[in-house]
Every structure is written in C-alpha cells, then in structure tokens.
C-alpha cells in the first residue's frame, strides 16, 4: 500500500499558495484493509474514506468509464491493480494531476509542473470531454488564477466549445451550476469565469440572459465601451474590488439584464430597463435555484440602480420611497449593498474605473437624517395603528426636506 498527496494541495503548494485541505490517494489497497486500520468509508459511488485521526479524505486509486449522460454518468473501478498513473489520468487538468509521495517526491506523468510554470490550464486527456461539469470547473480555475497570469490552452478551449455545442451541458443540475458559479463569484476575478463561458459557447446555454447583453449598444457618451455585455463584466470586476460578498457581485452581474429586452429600434437607449430586468433576474434565479437573499438584492439593484445614480436630485418623498422599497429600516445592511453595486455600475465603464462615487455619501447622509427621526416620540404622541406609520413617514420626509434645503444653501 502506498499513499500520495494529490490534487489542489500539491498544485497550491507549488504555487506557494495557502493549502486549505488535503486529499490523498491510496494505491494497492482494498476497502477492507482501510476499514481494519480504522478509516471510515463515506463514498457510496466510489471508495472514499476518512482518516481516523485527521479526518482528511483518502480515496482508493480508481478509473472511471463513461456509462451515461452528464457528470454522474460514470462507472467507477477501484482495485489494488489500479496504478497512480491510471488514477491521475482521469483528472481534469494537468495542474491537478500531480502527486507527491511521503518522502516528498513528485509524480507528474502529464507534465502538470511545466504547465504550472507556464501558467497554462490544460486538460489531461480526451476523457475530459465526458464530464460537462468540467467546463464550469475550468472557467472557475481561470477566474481563480487569472491574477497569476493563467490562461486556458487552446486545445482545451476547443474541447470545451465542442462540449457546449454537444448539448451535454443540459445534463447539469441547477444546483451544480449554481455551486460552481458561487465558487467562481468568490474568486479574485469572477468576470473571467463568465468571459470563459462566453468564449466556449456555454454562457448562451447556461446564462442566456447574460449572453443576450453582448452586442447590445448603450450611448457612447455614458458608455465609451458601448457594448452592454462588456460593461456588465467590467461592473462585476469593479464589484469584486469593492466587496467579497457573493450577493453584491451577483447583483452587479444582473443589474442591466433588462437592456437585453430593449427593441433594436430603440437602441442605444434603454428606458425602463430597470423594472424590465427584475423579471429576468427572477427567471434566472428560479431556474438555477439561487438562494433568496442573493435573488432579493439582485432584483432591488436591477430596479433601483439608476435612481441611486441621480440620488442628489431626488425629491424628499422619492428618497423616502427608495428607502422603503429597499427595506432599509429593517435591513440597514442593504444601504451599503445598494451603494456598492451602484458604484460598481458607475465605475464599470471605460475611462470611469477610478472615478469617485459621491452619490454613496449623499445616500448615507440622507439615511442618517431619515433614520434619526424618533419612532418613540411618534408613539408617545398618542397616535394609533396606521396613523403612527403615516406620521413617521411625514416626519422623515420633513427632516429630509429641511436637510436638502441646507445642502442646497451650502452649495450656493
């Protein structure tokens, strides 16, 4: 029996990155041998065991053979005669197919170390094409390692394109698509994930609402990049700089979906694209079973981001309606989420990337004024029921009106 460290732990250590979890492969053993040593079996479809002390995963070396559609349609063979090279051959990328022995020796039959040095993501074998999930995984790795200069090998991108055209991606479950997408949204360069999916044709299959934005023009005065799809990915890139939150990054991705519905004769203008985009966000989130908190913020951003851009021109009653709409009284964190996504939208334009976003400070100050109105004083005035709500609204609106007056006077 021989045990090797494999996969991401080896890859990340070679890149001098933190190793968060370790996976091991066991060659020349049977399930019975591992069970006798105190390992606990957890894999149903293939033999994976938890170490009795470290609880890290140890898998028997195995091969896989395509036996059906999708990423679950595989027959697994695990036995003592399966070699380490056999096991590494079934892996997705060469950089993930490097093993390290107990004495520190690297076993690298598919030249993963060379691809790491050259910053290339390359598939190990043509068996890559049998698992549609790998299209998303490679796009995610491209996003994760983009800051290190990694690119996808042309032959791997070609294979991914063939997979996108084959119809195999339709075998992916919504939960699996969202899980990979959520991981990609957490990377340093989430926009790269969607760009890779577009380049191989998978975006049109899995995210048609986003694909539809490419080729849709916006006024050059406000959008020198012109193309709404390009603007969308630029917005996502800025959002990733502003916040690590998946909710904010996803909302940035979806903020302009409504522009994909604008009739061509109205181009490059997109009046009413905000409310129109809300239905598309709902549709996308239902299809991929995206969590409700992520969906809710994306819908609010789609509807109100343009209003926030003009916040300093809004009447007190409109400001109050905005605060009520985003439910900022019960969910004050929404204010920063809305500001950050709107800022990402404003800066996600060619030549605007480093511009300040004073609307954010204005909105924060307006909220402080409105939120400073005492609910206790309204209740103490003797009002009952809905009259309390109405009086609270009136006082908040009055406070905003007085504050705006002082703001305007100060700027003269």
From Swiss-Prot:
Signal peptide residue numbers: none
GO molecular function: ATP binding; CCA tRNA nucleotidyltransferase activity; CCACCA tRNA nucleotidyltransferase activity; cyclic-nucleotide phosphodiesterase activity; magnesium ion binding; phosphatase activity; tRNA binding
Binding site residues for Mg(2+): 21, 23
Domain HD: 228-329
Record keywords, A-Z: ATP-binding, Hydrolase, Magnesium, Metal-binding, Multifunctional enzyme, Nickel, Nucleotide-binding, Nucleotidyltransferase, RNA repair, RNA-binding, Transferase, tRNA processing
Cofactor needs: Mg(2+); Ni(2+)
Reactions the enzyme catalyzes: a tRNA precursor + 2 CTP + ATP = a tRNA with a 3' CCA end + 3 diphosphate; a tRNA with a 3' CCA end + 2 CTP + ATP = a tRNA with a 3' CCACCA end + 3 diphosphate
Family the UniProt entry places it in: Belongs to the tRNA nucleotidyltransferase/poly(A) polymerase family. Bacterial CCA-adding enzyme type 1 subfamily.
Job of this protein: Catalyzes the addition and repair of the essential 3'-terminal CCA sequence in tRNAs without using a nucleic acid template. Adds these three nucleotides in the order of C, C, and A to the tRNA nucleotide-73, using CTP and ATP as substrates and producing inorganic pyrophosphate. tRNA 3'-terminal CCA addition is required both for tRNA processing and repair. Also involved in tRNA surveillance by mediating tandem CCA addition to generate a CCACCA at the 3' terminus of unstable tRNAs. While stable tRNAs receive only 3'-terminal CCA, unstable tRNAs are marked with CCACCA and rapidly degraded.
PANTHER family the record matches: MULTIFUNCTIONAL CCA PROTEIN (PTHR47545:SF1)
Subunit structure: Monomer. Can also form homodimers and oligomers.
The protein, known as: Multifunctional CCA protein
Source species of the chain: Yersinia pestis
């Amino acid at each position: 029996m021989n045990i090797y460290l494999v996969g991401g732990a080896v890859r990340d250590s070679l890149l001098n990155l933190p190793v968060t979890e370790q996976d091991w492969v066991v060659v020349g053993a049977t399930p019975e041998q591992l069970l006798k040593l105190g390992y606990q079996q957890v894999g149903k479809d293939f033999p994976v065991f938890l170490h009795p002390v470290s609880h890290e995963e140890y898998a028997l070396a195995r091969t896989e053979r395509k036996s059906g559609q999708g990423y679950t349609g595989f027959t697994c063979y695990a036995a003592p005669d399966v070699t380490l090279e056999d096991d590494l051959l079934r892996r997705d990328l060469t950089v993930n197919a490097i093993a390290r022995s107990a004495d520190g020796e690297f076993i690298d039959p598919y030249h993963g170390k060379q691809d790491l040095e050259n910053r290339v993501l390359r598939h190990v074998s043509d068996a890559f094409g049998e698992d549609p999930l790998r299209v998303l995984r490679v796009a995610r790795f491209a996003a994760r390692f983009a800051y290190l200069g990694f690119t996808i090998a042309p032959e791997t991108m070609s294979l991914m394109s063939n997979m996108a055209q084959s119809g195999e991606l339709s075998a992916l479950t919504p939960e699996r698509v969202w899980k990979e997408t959520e991981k990609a949204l957490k990377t340093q360069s989430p926009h790269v994930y969607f760009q890779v999916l577009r380049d191989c044709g998978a975006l049109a299959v899995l995210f048609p609402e986003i694909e539809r934005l490419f080729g849709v023009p916006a006024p050059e005065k406000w959008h020198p990049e012109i193309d709404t799809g390009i603007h969308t990915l630029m917005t996502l890139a800025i959002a990733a700089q502003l916040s690590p939150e998946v909710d904010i990054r996803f909302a940035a991705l979806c903020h302009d979906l409504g522009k994909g519905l604008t009739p061509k004769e109205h181009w490059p203008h997109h009046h009413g694209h905000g409310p129109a985009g809300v239905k598309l966000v709902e549709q996308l989130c239902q299809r991929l079973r995206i969590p409700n908190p992520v969906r809710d913020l994306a819908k609010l951003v789609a509807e109100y981001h343009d209003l926030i851009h003009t916040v300093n021109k809004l009447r007190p009653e409109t400001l109050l309606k905005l605060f009520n709409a985003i439910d900022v009284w019960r969910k004050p964190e929404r204010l920063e989420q809305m500001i950050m996504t709107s800022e990402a939208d404003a800066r996600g334009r060619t030549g605007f990337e480093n511009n300040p976003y004073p609307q954010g400070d204005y909105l924060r100050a307006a909220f402080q004024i409105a939120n400073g109105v005492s609910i206790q004083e309204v209740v103490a005035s003797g009002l009952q029921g809905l009259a309390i709500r109405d009086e609270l609204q009136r006082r908040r609106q009055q406070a905003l009106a007085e504050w705006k007056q002082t703001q305007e006077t100060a700027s003269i």
